[in-house]
C-alpha cells in the first residue's frame, strides 16, 4: 500500500512538472506572437489617413480622433458611377466625444470647488 501511495505521489509530481513546462512553452509562444502583432500595429499606425481624405486604397487606415477611430465611409456621388471613400467620424461618436469633453471639463470644475 505504501508503494502505491509513493508511486501515486511521484506520478502526480511528474505530471504537474510536465504540464507546467508545457504552459511555459505556450506562454512564450503567445508572447512572441503578441510582440510581432504589436510591431505590425506600430508600423501600420504611422500611415493613417486623415479625416475627409480618400481611404479607398486601405479602408482600415483611418486615423483616430480623441476617443474613437474614424470610419471609412463609401458612397456614390450624385450623377456619378465611381465610388468615393473618405474617412469620417459617425455622428453618434462625435456627440459622445463632445459629451465626454464636457463631462471632463465639469469634473475639473468640481475638483476645483471641493479640491
From Swiss-Prot:
Pfam families: Toxin_35 (PF10530). Expressed by the venom gland. GO terms for cellular component: extracellular region. Keywords: Disulfide bond, Knottin, Secreted, Signal, Toxin. Transmembrane segments: none annotated. InterPro entries: Spider_toxin_CSTX_knottin, Spider_toxin_CSTX_Knottin_CS. The keyword Secreted applies. It comes from the Eukaryota. It is found in: Secreted. Residues 21-44 form a propeptide. Disulfide bonds join 48-63, 55-72, 62-87, 74-85. One of its GO terms (molecular function) is toxin activity. Residues 1-20 form the signal peptide. The presence of a 'disulfide through disulfide knot' structurally defines this protein as a knottin. Belongs to the neurotoxin 19 (CSTX) family. 01 subfamily. This is U3-lycotoxin-Ls1o. It comes from Lycosa singoriensis.
Amino acid at each position: 500500500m505504501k508503494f502505491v501511495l509513493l508511486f501515486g505521489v511521484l506520478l502526480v509530481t511528474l505530471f504537474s512538472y510536465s504540464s507546467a513546462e508545457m504552459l511555459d512553452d505556450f506562454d512564450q509562444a503567445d508572447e512572441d506572437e503578441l510582440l510581432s502583432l504589436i510591431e505590425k500595429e506600430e508600423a501600420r499606425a504611422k500611415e493613417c489617413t486623415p479625416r475627409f481624405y480618400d481611404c479607398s486604397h486601405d479602408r482600415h487606415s483611418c486615423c483616430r480622433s480623441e476617443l474613437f477611430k474614424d470610419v471609412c465611409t463609401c458612397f456614390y456621388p450624385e450623377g456619378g458611377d465611381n465610388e468615393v471613400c473618405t474617412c469620417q467620424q459617425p455622428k453618434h461618436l462625435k456627440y459622445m466625444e463632445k459629451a465626454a469633453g464636457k463631462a471632463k471639463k465639469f469634473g475639473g470644475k468640481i475638483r476645483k470647488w471641493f479640491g
